[in-house]
Curated annotation (Swiss-Prot):
Usually encoded in the trnK tRNA gene intron. Probably assists in splicing its own and other chloroplast group II introns. InterPro entries: Domain_X, Maturase_MatK, Maturase_MatK_N. It comes from Proboscidea louisianica. The keyword Chloroplast applies. This is Maturase K. It is found in: Plastid, Chloroplast. GO terms for biological process: mRNA processing; RNA splicing; tRNA processing. Keywords: Chloroplast, mRNA processing, Plastid, RNA-binding, tRNA processing. Belongs to the intron maturase 2 family. MatK subfamily. The lineage of its organism: Eukaryota, Viridiplantae, Streptophyta, Embryophyta, Tracheophyta. GO terms for cellular component: chloroplast.
Length: 500
């Protein structure tokens, strides 16, 4: 990494990194191979060892030096002897090497940024559960939210022209762009092998959109935003700041039109493609931002994005579906007794409270899709391998149950998870009974329901049962919301399909 960093410092021109010469360096493909990018190329029934893999890379680099293969049309490349043999293999090597190369400057910027802000253990700040305390502190005072699904890009701009020609070359040679953007089961092997490059291109599109959006938000808000990019350890992408004011208005009309969307209190959060824009403004104000974003995508990114894909919802009467939770702002009534001299009276106060619930119906649909139950929520048995032991089966079901309890530990009403635990518990019992060719009742009678419940006990239940006698302060642990710092991705069963 030090050698790459020295090269980039020497070859940097106008703050843009020209990565084209790195394609001809052998150590780049070695790094890509060591990081697991090329594992699928060498290890799937090809019989290549490390020595022969290095020889293939050397031969590829030698042939790239001999001829200019990056400006060839698709028809000419079909007649080129360079691609006549091992065409797919060479294309995969270049594509995966390219995926590693384009991440180098952004990784270096991320490391230097973390060192500059003296953030040592930033991995503890990656938890997606850290979003919900932010929502609790801010969303209870807001009125409307925009539910936004960020569209896929039609094209992605790369400032390095030489690398852009290379990217265009192997994309034309290896697959079509539509299958890359919307990979299917029967798509080309590019989308299956090199998902890292696809994610890099899409994230670069999203980060360019967000960099411009944050700039516009800062211009229209009295509050200065705090970047969460370092806290989430995202790769930084720097757009062209000098063209931000020309997104869809001219420089002359920029400040004149910006007052239409000015708001002193706005908040923006995103996870993957789902983003939320919340404000204290009115419905008319949110409609202005909706039109603003649609025009922004159409003019700056050449994307057709229908306005009906952005939903305007009021927090007081709508539940926000985000990160596997149903979040809403509800009124929490409280009665206060006040007494002045001989007169006593009651005061009714309604306090806004941010509430997080478990979406039971979508979660049951996810369990039904995973064959734990039917569409009505009735538990069913799962076919298992005959060589699995009973303890292994119980441990697998228990792990699923504990992971769900761990992820939904921030729910305001944890009793709603009892139905999910019941489905998993009975599905496990039916699976074991099917294996032993017995009935569920007979199997539970022989095994003992206490043993099965011990495996399916959630983390909070274990904590309460272990320390309940030692401390009375833990008695409310089952009713309190707990946010963990070790959850960096959404649970697979909780990642059900939303209305988008």
């Amino acid at each position: 990494m030090e050698e790459i960093q020295r090269y980039l410092q020497l070859e940097r021109s106008q703050q843009h990194d020209f990565l084209y010469p790195l394609i001809f360096q052998e150590y780049i493909y070695t790094f890509a191979h060591d990081h697991g990018f090329s594992r699928s190329i060498w290890s799937k029934n090809r019989g290549y060892d490390n020595k022969s893999s290095l020889l293939i890379v050397k031969r590829l680099i030698t042939r790239m030096y001999q001829q200019n293969h990056f400006l060839i049309s698709l028809n000419d490349s079909n007649q080129n002897p360079f691609w006549a043999r091992n065409k797919n293999l060479y294309s995969q090597i270049i594509s995966e090497g390219f995926a590693f190369i384009v991440e180098i400057p952004f990784s270096i910027r991320l490391i230097s940024c973390l060192e500059g802000k003296k953030i040592v253990k930033s991995q503890n700040l990656r938890s997606i559960h850290s979003i919900f305390p932010f929502l609790e502190x801010n969303f209870s005072h807001l009125n409307f939210v925009l539910d936004i699904l960020i569209p896929h890009p039609v094209h992605v701009e790369i400032l390095d022209a030489s690398s852009l020609h290379l990217l265009r070359f192997f994309l034309n040679e290896y697959c079509n762009w539509n299958s890359l953007i919307t990979p299917k089961k029967a798509s080309s092997s590019f989308s299956k092998i090199n998902q890292r490059l696809f994610l890099f291109l899409y994230n670069s599109h999203v980060c360019e959109y967000e960099s411009i959006f944050v700039f516009l938000r800062n211009q229209s808000s009295h509050l200065r935003s705090t970047s969460s990019g370092v806290l989430l350890e995202r790769i930084y992408f720097y757009g062209k700041i000098e063209h931000l004011v020309n997104v869809f208005v001219t420089v002359k009309d920029f400040q004149a039109n910006l007052w239409l969307v000015k708001e002193p209190c706005m908040h923006y959060i995103r996870y993957q493609r789902k983003s939320i824009l919340a404000s204290k403004g009115t419905s008319l104000f949110m409609n202005k931002w909706k039109c603003y974003l649609v025009t922004f995508w159409q003019w700056h990114f050449s994307l057709w994005f229908h306005p009906s894909r952005i939903y305007i919802n009021q927090l007081s009467n709508h539940s926000l579906e985000f990160l596997g939770y149903l979040s809403s702002v509800r009124m929490n009534p409280s009665v206060v007794r006040s007494q002045i001299l001989e007169n006593a009276f009651l005061i009714n106060n309604a306090i806004k409270k941010f509430d997080t619930l478990v979406p039971i119906i979508p979660l049951i649909a996810s369990l039904a899709k995973a064959k734990f139950c039917n569409v009505l929520g009735h538990p069913i048995s799962k076919p298992v391998r005959a060589d699995l032991s009973d303890s292994n089966i119980i441990d697998r079901f228990g792990c699923i149950c504990r992971n769900l309890s761990h992820y939904h530990s921030g729910s305001s009403k944890k009793k709603s998870l009892y139905r999910i635990k019941y489905i998993l518990r009975l599905s496990c019992a039916r699976t074991l009974a099917r294996k032993h060719k017995s009935t569920v009742r007979a199997f539970l009678k022989r095994l003992g329901s206490e043993l099965l419940e011990q495996f399916l006990m959630s983390e909070e239940d274990v904590l309460f049962x272990t320390f309940x006698k030692a401390s009375s302060t833990l008695r409310g642990v089952n009713n309190s919301r707990i946010w963990y710092v070790d959850i960096i991705s959404i649970n697979d069963l909780a990642x059900h399909k939303s209305k988008f």
